[in-house]
Amino acid sequence: MADSSPQLAKLRSLMKERKVHVYVIPSEDSHSSEYIAACDARREFISGFTGSAGCAIVTLEAAALATDGRYFNQAAKQLDGNWTLLKQGLQDVPTWQEWAASQSAGGKIVAVDPSLLPGSAAKKLNDQVRKAGGADLVPLDENIVDIAWGDSRPERPCQPVSVLPDELAGKPVATKIEELRQELAKKNCPGFFVSMLDEVAWLFNLRGSDIPYNPVFFSYATITPETAILYVDESKLDDSCRAHLRENNVQVKPYDSFLPDARHLHTEVKTKRQAGGDGVVIGNFLISNKASWAMSRALGGDGSVEEMRSPVGDAKAVKNETEMNGMRACHVRDGAALIEFFAWLEDQLVDKKIMIDEVQAADKLEQLRSKQQHFVGLSFPTISSTGANAAIIHYGPEKGSCATIDAGSVYLCDSGAQYRDGTTDTTRTLHFGKPSDAEKKAYTLVLKGLIGLDTAVFPKGTTGFALDCLARQHLWKNGLDYRHGTGHGVGSYLNVHEGPIGIGTRVQYTEVPLAPGNVLSNEPGYYEDGNFGIRIENIMMVREVQTEHCFGDKSYLGFEHVTMVPYCQSLIERDMLTADEKAWLNAYNDEVLKNTRGFFEGDDLTMSWLTRETRPVE
């Protein structure tokens, strides 16, 4: 772990100059991105913690880092003695908001960069701070972490943007904009402001590479009843992008002019309301509930702005037939790359006795993926983990310090790729030797949970929250569980983690029912710290299913899995499976063999491994 004292000293000096006692440093950028560019990794810079989720709070005397169960082990290793780790979700552990508020008693000032915190989150934090005896939450428009970072802060990326043609996107830009305007008309809304990068990319059928692993670009958008404006650094756009936007009547303005334009539009609409008399009805501006406090303030705040779940995000989460066909196709190709990789890895470790470390394995997998049609890059850093490292849920192997893969231990590989026709995310846990009874039992309990969720049939209107227990039920019966969600939404050649849908216990998963066209992961797991970790993950699509009856005139839904990679035969405890589970597993194996064997003509090594791992489970 690196010493965080120098950067904390610089930050505290800046806090004192501004009479700030508590400074909040979220993980996200000004677009609420989960994955961020290096220039926006402020929480990592100040704390040394590299996980994708968490919040740092620095006072003049103390510092705390809050994160969720995926990152408890990682944070404990990366944080130095300056930091207190707040394990979110555990009993008697305060939330980061509660901890920040507790430091504000006596009228102390709590501050945050308003571009990094959603307006709703800022309001909640302000309420807690005031209740604890602090002053009103202060929006500091200058980010003092950036000042402390100084010249060593990386430059903001400015990568080229490309057009995603309709034959891959499945829906023209004009149609998407018109459907959004129809939603705005229902509320007499003068404008909707799009801040999430994947929503901008989806809305305009454009892709970029400003943020690693995510085909997005720094941008905002404004949609009014008359205009559509894309705010982006124009140097990113080539002639084809400009023509594409012109054809769809989209104006282009500089990225940095977004907030000034929002302030101007607020003033303009306010004037129209005042001049229009009783007959003029103009609703509030609409922004996403993830839009920044800075955006809300620019548009006039309470009384002028209505926060809501983004209608763009909702539309994006329901894939069209073109996108679903792309997801099917890219997962077959991706599965072929994984099958070839696992066969190669076993041959290296077991037959040839060659030492392979976690990073070398991840690099080999990326090389095999890169040969597949439409490959663009990875969708997240590959989690290549052996033995005890597999118990670190979001483990990140580092070159030079990672472990050598032990053929006698569990190996967990969670990986994915971006293809122009879809996004993949697959986890398989393997053992290249003789697994222990405990490992086999844990693996089979996890597999049973995956099958239970995959085969679920449920009425339309059911949420992911309601289905979560299907994946955990067999672990629960044994007093076991896992500290992460069961499923997240997946983008179509977009972010591998996509809202608003998911399967888990988060409150947000109670709000949005699953719908045909949703694409989600199914990834139960089990982890023993210091020993081993098990996770199995498939991607599946929500589809309508035919049932014998139709109670209440409701339609019923189920899942179609698209991941095509075998499970580890040596880790399956067959006596723990029911006849139905064995039948499902054998049907899945037949499906994998049928869809992928054509990739391995002349490749006896891979074909032998595939045949063995898809053999019937008796």
Curated annotation (Swiss-Prot):
PROSITE patterns: PROLINE_PEPTIDASE. This is Probable Xaa-Pro aminopeptidase P. Its EC number is 3.4.11.9. Its cofactor is Mn(2+). GO terms for cellular component: cytoplasm. GO terms for biological process: proteolysis. It catalyses: Release of any N-terminal amino acid, including proline, that is linked to proline, even from a dipeptide or tripeptide. InterPro entries: Creatin/AminoP/Spt16_N, Creatinase/aminopeptidase-like, Creatinase_N, Pept_M24, Pept_M24B, Peptidase_M24_C, Peptidase_M24B_aminopep-P_CS, X-Pro_aminopeptidase_P. SUPFAM superfamilies: Creatinase/aminopeptidase, Creatinase/prolidase N-terminal domain. Catalyzes the removal of a penultimate prolyl residue from the N-termini of peptides. Signal peptide: none annotated. Mn(2+) 2 binds at residues 414, 425, 537. Pfam families: Creatinase_N (PF01321), Creatinase_N_2 (PF16189), Peptidase_M24 (PF00557), Peptidase_M24_C (PF16188).
